Amino acid sequence: MVNMKASMFLTFAGLVLLFVVCYAPESEEKEFPKEMLSSIFAVDNDFKQEERDCAGYMRECKEKLCCSGYVCSSRWKWCVLPAPWRR
């Protein structure tokens, strides 16, 4: 009984997929989902990480100095929060 339900679900899902593929015969209509996804996942310039002269938390501190509030870990060479046991 469960196997029959699964096969019916897969058949129905296949028919829905076939309908979606055949529904947009023109290339302009096929581009709509791509445009929608690209607009949803577009990265705005305001949200991009900016280059700094210092390294932030968990960044390599080999070439760059750590930003204020962080110290360079002597073991891992990452910028970490200062703590009494890390001095």
Curated annotation (Swiss-Prot):
This is U3-theraphotoxin-Hhn1a 3. Pfam families: Toxin_12 (PF07740). Ion channel inhibitor. Residues 1-24 form the signal peptide. Keywords: Disulfide bond, Ion channel impairing toxin, Knottin, Secreted, Signal, Toxin. It is found in: Secreted. Residues 25-52 form a propeptide. GO terms for molecular function: ion channel inhibitor activity; toxin activity. It comes from the Eukaryota. Its main location: secreted. Disulfide bonds join C54-C67, C61-C72, C66-C79. Belongs to the neurotoxin 10 (Hwtx-1) family. 51 (Hntx-8) subfamily. Hntx-8 sub-subfamily. Expressed by the venom gland.
